[in-house]
From Swiss-Prot:
Chief localisation class: cytoplasm
Name of protein: Protein RecA
One GO cellular component term: cytoplasm
Location relative to the cell: Cytoplasm
Stretches that traverse the bilayer: none
Record family assignment: Belongs to the RecA family.
Sample GO molecular function, one term: ATP hydrolysis activity
């Protein structure tokens, strides 16, 4: 019996080795494997989400889909990724197919709008050809396409109202992604598609939710992030933002199905200090007794707001705590700005 199991194990190892040679590392791996594919990443702006991805953020040289219902925080998350890439000296491009980007809001999130390249294409083919040219240049670190639903084929725009256009967008996406996949890998560009959730008509069993653009994007994406709005964030009875849950529904680089929750504050974006406090508490770096938080021998305050104020007054602690959190989670680098102002919130 043991000899039979040993032979099976050897046969499996040979098969996995051959698969890895043909399709790359991470094509098949144990679900609970601690080992992760080593890849360069861009932080998401949320420490909890960086940990949930298993690799520290949005992978470069790969395709990522961020999808969710309207006003769930998809574009906010993508803009935070752009801001993090720019902080590290990277070049970022925003392909605004929806023609809806607000530069003032982007600036509040930390985006260097003066050095952000933006394109507002007239139709889907133009948007994807622009993306392909930029990727092939090898000079761009991250490209965000907002959104797949707005990538309308030229034929559809030039056709008559009410004319059947079944499957044209799906074919467009399928053709484009076959070309883009290899180019993205060679250029080490992070390509992010923002997508919406729609409901299938007449579905009585199973999940009625779907995303526009056909199945190609689901197939070619190395990482898919589902963004859900949980509820309002209130302070003194006043709504100041909303709580978001992001689920990693597909991950070729680390075990999938991890989740992260964080707050998005109106006009400010992701509350990075709130995120840091929650993650540090969950990992045992902060201790909590009742509503009091402590860090080692230091008493930080009663309630999150007092802890935030304490950290803003002692910015040197932010980076120290951030590093400890990342080490405890198996990540490296820093994602929190040392700031005593609004950006540190």
């Amino acid at each position: 019996m043991s000899e039979n199991l040993s032979e099976k194990k050897k046969a499996l190892e040979v098969a996995l080795s051959n698969i890895e040679k043909r399709f790359g590392k991470g094509a098949v791996m144990p679900l609970k494997s601690v080992e992760k594919v080593q890849v360069e990443t861009i932080p998401t702006g949320s420490l909890a989400l960086d940990i949930a991805t298993g690799v520290g953020g949005i992978p470069k040289g790969r395709i990522t889909e961020i999808f969710g219902v309207e006003s769930s925080g998809k574009t906010t998350l993508a803009l935070h990724v752009i801001a993090e890439a720019q902080k590290r000296g990277g070049v970022a491009v925003f392909i605004d197919a929806e023609h809806a980007l607000d530069p003032k809001y982007a600036k509040k999130l930390g985006v260097d709008v003066e050095n952000l390249y933006i394109s507002q294409p007239d139709y889907g083919e133009q948007a994807l050809e622009i993306a392909e040219s930029l990727i092939n240049s090898g000079a761009v670190d991250v490209i965000v396409v907002d959104s797949v639903a707005a990538l309308v084929p030229k034929d559809e725009l030039e056709g008559e109202m009410g004319e059947a256009q079944v499957g044209k967008q799906a074919r467009l996406m399928s053709q484009a992604l076959r070309k883009l996949k290899g180019a993205v890998h060679k250029s080490n560009t992070a390509l992010i598609f923002i997508n919406q959730i729609r409901e299938k008509i007449g579905v009585m069993f199973g999940n009625p939710e779907t995303t526009p653009g056909g199945r190609a994007l689901k197939f070619f994406s190395d990482m898919r992030l589902e963004v859900r709005r949980l509820g309002d964030v209130k302070e003194g009875g006043e709504k100041k933002g909303y709580r978001v849950k992001v689920r990693v529904v597909k991950n070729k680089l680390a075990p999938p199905f991890q989740e992260a929750e964080f707050d998005i504050i109106y006009g400010e974006g992701i509350c990075k200090l709130c995120d840091l406090i929650e993650v540090a508490t969950n990992l045992g770096i902060f201790t909590k007794s009742g509503s009091w938080y402590s860090y080692g021998d230091k008493r930080l305050g009663q309630g999150k707001e007092q802890v935030k104020k304490y950290l803003q007054e002692h910015p040197e602690l932010i980076d120290e705590i951030d590093q400890k959190v990342r080490e405890a989670a198996g990540l490296a680098g820093s994602n929190i700005e040392e700031s005593t102002g609004e950006e540190g919130k």
